[in-house]
A protein has these predicted regions:
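Iron-sulfur cluster-binding cysteine motifs and their immediate structural context
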Residues: 21, 45-71, 98-125, 166, ...
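Beta1-alpha1 glycine-rich phosphate/pyrophosphate-binding loop at the start
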Residues: 26-27, 49-51, 58-75, 113, ...
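Ferredoxin-like iron-sulfur electron-transfer modules
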Residues: 33-53, 84-103, 135-151, 185-186, ...
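Glycine-rich dinucleotide-binding loop and its adjacent helix/turn
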Residues: 123-142, 203-220, 243-316, 323, ...
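Feature captures the FAD/FMN-dependent oxidoreductase FAD-binding
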Residues: 142, 147-149, 199-248, 366-379, ...
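Glycine-/small-residue-rich beta->alpha transition segments that form the dinucleotide
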Residues: 231-233, 237-245, 261, 284-286, ...
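FAD-site-proximal beta/loop scaffold in flavoenzymes
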Residues: 255-279, 367, 386-453, 459
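A conserved FAD-binding loop/helix module that cradles the flavin
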Residues: 291, 445-475
């Protein structure tokens, strides 16, 4: 028989524990033996795995909940602007990342255990594109009088400049090239990143008051010593612009063997309009996919001469060559099988549709060089992988004909002029706060720390900006949390909606549930814990198909000269519908299950004038019998039976 509410009031405190009760009983499955439990529900915010998997550290659950209408803005702010503000707290490039990020967040999505992941990228693109269409802008913080030099105008540099201006610090960006954007402009083709959208997201940052000095190389046009005199701190966001060559015989010194970055930059800056007749690219990541996809689009024209000529100088092809181009052959080789390649699955599928030949499980052995000193082919063989080491399969050797061989197997830094900052890998060493090791006042972010994703560079820039702020304000560097992301803050939300708790009056109390100076029975563990799918009530969720973006992927007969954007955005209705597929892991999404199924009517909705995101329900502990049905039926894993432990 369950303990009566009157006996519970008499025998227990509000926390529902007994003196000497230190054993954590496993009550899972014992919901009909409720009188055994002295535990009552507590509300726990945890990080969803999408956010835990996001290198930029975005509050993904937060802006999905805004788009779907669960979390609402105050005043007359639109849903679109509110979602934009939440997304750009971490990432000032939602339109770009919604298009080209390989989306590790989607791989980590708990919805994969129900039907299919939430199309996070597609909703992010909707947020970013809508912000551009509506002219949403950023506000700079109140001036601190501090100045920061940002070396590099790519994703890391511009993201850092954005965060620094929000903090009130002056930021000057030094960029070696003629335009800002880094890899987003010079490494990724325009049919994946529309240049007008890129310009809009860059200009929005510049309009915060960021000073820009293009065509300026630090170490050549301005010295490090001068930077240290003129600025209070320096952030190095150089990127990695030196492509790695193939470590096989015949590569070094062969003119028509080039790296993928050289190839893509020549195309993206408008110099290269046609290429070779037979292109072979070695890689398996997104860069290699871009190389072969570009080659298929621009094609071949014999009148252009040797394909490497335009890559090894600063000349520009005449447009007439492109107008008379014919299709070329493009082959991509990868050590890994297709299911293990680093490129996004849809990029591999699209490239195949466009007529690219993909040879997976193949390793390069030798560049075949002709009598004229140019490569005529690439000798390869089948292989298997032992970890990251290829193991050749004997008897499978063959030669792939080629008049241009492109290596897209990684990249390194160009530290000429700033060699004092280089490590033995020609990168820059950083500590956990992205300070340059043994260089006070110098910080670093992006590929020059470790070549990785655009979203990784953006995430590092955010952490580096926080560290710079601490340095400039003479504050102790904060210890980075285990789950180092941008998190929803209930305390900030309460302030936003006018429900800020009262100041603590230091008077005795029967319990915090009776007072308004505390957020009672809530614990934010988002900086320490990621919630797994097995903590959710998955039976709550119906199977719902993803809302897919329309793609303009040409086939092999249509690809020549096809430069239309590949990925169309979702309309508002589809974006909202896709956001509604989010399971809001680790945060209440106001389903009412706990209220409906509580047999004691102990769980109740908070009054509307006191309710907000994360404070939708509460518990009357004088009625709770510890049956933990509320926790069992909570779809999002927001309820733990923790009170009384």
């Amino acid at each position: 028989m369950a303990t009566s509410s009157e006996e519970m009031k008499k025998d227990h405190t509000f926390r529902r524990y007994e003196d000497g009760d230190y054993i954590n009983d496993d009550m899972h499955g014992n919901i009909f033996q409720a009188s055994w439990s002295h535990k009552c529900p507590t509300y726990i915010q945890r990080t969803p795995p999408c956010q835990g998997s996001c290198p930029a550290g975005e509050d993904i659950r937060g802006w999905l909940d805004i788009v779907r209408g669960i979390e609402k803005p105050t005043g007359d702010m639109s849903m679109q602007e509110y979602a934009f503000r939440r997304a750009t707290d971490a990432n000032p490039f939602p339109s770009m990342m919604g298009r080209v990020c390989p989306a590790p967040c989607e791989e980590g999505c708990n919805r994969n255990h129900v039907d299919d992941f939430v199309g996070i990228n597609s909703v992010e693109q909707y947020i970013g594109d809508t912000a551009i269409e509506n002219g949403f802008s950023y506000e700079a913080g109140a001036s601190t009088g501090k100045k920061v030099a940002v070396i590099g105008g790519g994703p890391a540099g511009m993201a850092a400049a954005y965060q620094l201006r929000r903090m009130g610090h002056a930021a000057t960006v030094f960029e070696e090239r003629a335009e800002l954007g880094g890899m987003m402009r010079y490494g990724i083709p325009g049919y994946r990143i529309p240049r007008e959208k890129l310009a809009a997201e860059i200009n929005r940052i510049v309009d915060m008051g960021v000073e820009v000095k293009t065509n300026t190389r630090v170490g050549k046009d301005i010295s490090t010593d001068q930077l240290e005199k003129d600025f209070d701190a320096v952030l190095w966001a150089l990127g990695c612009w030196t492509g790695r060559g193939l470590p096989v015989d015949g590569w070094d010194g062969t003119s028509n063997c080039v790296d993928g970055l050289t190839f893509l930059e020549a195309f993206n800056n408008g110099r290269m309009k046609v290429t070779g007749q037979k292109i072979v690219c070695i890689g398996g990541g997104d860069t290699s996919i871009d190389v072969v996809s570009v080659a298929r689009r621009i094609g071949y024209n014999a009148e252009a001469g040797l394909p490497e000529a335009i890559l090894n100088n600063n000349e520009t092809h005449d447009q007439s060559l492109a107008d008379a181009a014919v299709p070329c052959d493009a082959t991509l080789t990868s050590l890994f099988t297709k299911d293990k390649m680093f490129a996004a699955e849809h990029e591999i599928t699209d490239a195949t549709e466009e007529g690219v030949t993909i040879l997976d499980g193949v390793m390069p052995l030798e560049v075949i060089v002709g009598d004229d000193g140019r490569a005529t082919g690439l000798k390869v063989c089948d292989c298997t992988m032992d970890g990251m080491t290829p193991v050749p399969t004997e008897g499978t050797e063959r030669v792939i004909e080629a008049d241009l061989i492109v290596a897209a197997i990684g990249q390194g830094g160009d530290m000429e002029g700033v060699e004092d900052f280089a490590n033995d890998r020609n990168l820059i060493n950083a500590d956990k706060n992205y300070q340059v090791v043994d260089k006070p006042g110098h910080f670093v972010a992006g590929d020059i720390v470790r070549p990785h994703l655009l979203t990784t560079a953006i995430g590092q820039a955010s952490v580096a900006a926080e560290s710079i702020n601490s340095y400039l304000m003479a504050e102790k560097m904060a210890r980075r949390p285990k789950v180092d992301k941008h998190h929803f803050s209930l305390s900030e939300k309460l302030v936003e909606v006018g429900l800020e708790p009262d100041p603590y009056d230091k008077q005795s109390s029967t319990g915090t549930s009776e007072e308004n100076y505390a957020v009672h029975n809530f614990d934010d563990r988002s900086e320490h814990e990621i919630i797994n799918y097995d903590a959710l009530f998955l039976g709550h969720f119906e199977q719902v198909d993803r809302n897919l973006r329309a793609e303009d992927v040409p086939n092999s007969d249509q690809v020549l000269g096809h430069f239309h954007e590949r990925m169309a955005g979702l309309a508002e209705e589809a974006a909202v519908a896709e956001a509604e597929r989010c399971m809001s892991c680790g945060m209440c999404f106001e389903c009412d299950n706990c209220v409906i199924f509580c047999p004691q009517d102990a769980v109740y909705r908070v009054k509307k004038d006191q309710s907000t995101t994360g404070r939708y329900v509460a518990t009357d502990y004088s009625k709770c019998i510890g049956c933990h049905i509320c926790a069992e039926v909570c779809p999002t894993g927001y309820i733990d039976m923790g009170m009384g432990e």
